[in-house]
Swiss-Prot record:
Gene of this entry: rlmN
The protein's name: Dual-specificity RNA methyltransferase RlmN
Domain Radical SAM core: 111-350
Originating species: Escherichia coli O9:H4 (strain HS)
Residues annotated as catalytic: 105, 355
Keywords: 4Fe-4S, Cytoplasm, Disulfide bond, Iron, Iron-sulfur, Metal-binding, Methyltransferase, rRNA processing, S-adenosyl-L-methionine, Transferase, tRNA processing
Disulphide bridges, residue numbers: 118-355
The protein's required cofactors: [4Fe-4S] cluster
Length: 384
């Protein structure tokens, strides 16, 4: 469990009330204790909040009237609102969600046997990966716990209300939306705790995945805070290419990154002994057969499966998508080494909801100095 201090600065709303979506179960129990109530009341309220997506205390029928009145005075359940919805021809739904004066994007991806929700962790991103639309928007701020878990809450409420249309309930959550999750550990971890909690969304730890570009000290800290599935945004077979397309590699190179991944795997049960490697396919940049051989050699000591991701274009990007034939040749080389290799099916690209296309609406774009400061905060273990 994380130990984020509950203070008015990080959980109160503009109305001076506590937003209960900001609290994991440990914090919720402390909140009810401060109200003079038994801890089980926290469990009851969480069940209403997350099992039934209820944000009205009056509808919580197993809570006595006096306590409901007390809760209405000091607390609320306020998830961020959907301000725009786009539906893809393949069933994918993208929601633009208001977080203060900005927007982030959340994507619902239904499949035959599951439904995955792609969740954002920051408004914008500080890492400046060259092939990603989010990075081109700059960085504004971290999302609060309520703004992260609130994306899941809002999506679950919408999908739950639309069961008659055949939409599947959310079975998987991936922290692969806007932002670098490891640069916002103090909010991302409590949000994931709620996803896993039986009184929260009750997801299996194997069905909650965090994706990172390689903030190594924060990855080491993550392993001591929570156990979830891990995916890494590698995207290159060597440091020369990765330095160019994933600039954080200049600080934490591939060898350092993969060593941290192996340390995480030693602690984790959620990963079942292997990590997911994400590798975006950029035409004549990182997609040659020689690159595939280099990648296989690079990963020989890291138990993994490899997801090859056809690059999804956005305006002004300097890259092209690898052809199907180049992706096929690349994949066959990896499989010849015995790697489980999957070519990810592109979903939602007609509504700019595919991997690397999320942009949101970042207001007051910050300059490079703030991005450097943001990276420094994550690298300083005391600050994450």
């Amino acid at each position: 469990m994380s130990e984020q201090l509950v203070t008015p600065e990080n959980v109160t709303t503009k109305d001076g009330k506590i937003n209960l979506l900001d609290l994991n179960r440990q914090q919720m129990r402390e909140f009810f204790k401060d109200l003079g109530e038994k801890p089980f009341r926290a469990d009851q309220v969480m069940k209403w909040m997350y099992h039934y997506c209820c944000d009205n205390f009056d509808e919580m029928t197993d809570i006595n009237k006096v306590l409901r009145g007390k809760l209405k005075e000091v607390a609320e359940i306020r998830a961020p609102e959907v301000v725009e919805e786009q539906r893809s021809s393949d069933g994918t739904i993208k929601w633009a969600i208001a977080v203060g004066d900005q927007r982030v994007e959340t994507v619902y991806i239904p499949e035959v046997d599951r439904a995955t929700l792609c969740v954002s962790s920051q408004v914008g991103c500080a890492l400046e990966c060259k092939f990603c639309s989010t990075a081109q928007q700059g960085f504004n701020r971290n999302l609060r716990v309520s703004e992260i878990i609130g994306q899941v809450w809002r999506a679950a409420k919408i999908v739950g209300a639309a069961k008659v249309t055949g939409q599947r309930p959310i079975t998987n959550v991936v922290m692969m939306g806007m932002g670098e999750p490891l640069l916002n550990l103090n909010n991302v971890v409590p949000a994931m705790e709620i996803m896993l909690d039986d009184f929260g969304f009750g997801l299996s730890k194997r069905r909650v995945t965090l994706s990172t570009s390689g903030v190594v000290p924060a990855l080491d800290k993550l392993g001591d805070m929570i156990d979830v599935a891990l995916a890494i945004s590698l995207h290159a077979p060597n440091d020369e290419i990765r330095d160019e397309i994933v600039p954080i590699n200049k600080k934490y190179n591939i060898e350092t990154f993969l060593a941290a991944v192996r340390r995480y795997l030693e602690k984790s049960n959620a990963n079942q002994g292997r990590v997911t490697i994400e590798y975006v396919m950029l035409d004549h940049v990182n997609d040659g057969t020689e690159h595939a051989h280099q990648l296989a050699e690079l990963l020989k000591d890291t138990p993994c499966k490899i997801n090859l991701i056809p690059w999804n274009p956005f305006p002004g990007a300097p890259y092209g998508r690898s052809s199907n034939s180049r992706i096929d040749r690349f994949s066959k080389v990896l499989m010849s080494y015995g790697f489980t290799t999957i070519v990810r099916k592109t979903r939602g690209d007609d509504i700019d909801a595919a991997c690397g296309q999320l942009a949101g609406d970042v207001i007051d774009r910050t300059k490079r100095t703030l991005r450097k400061r943001m990276q420094g905060e994550a690298i300083d273990i005391k600050a994450v």
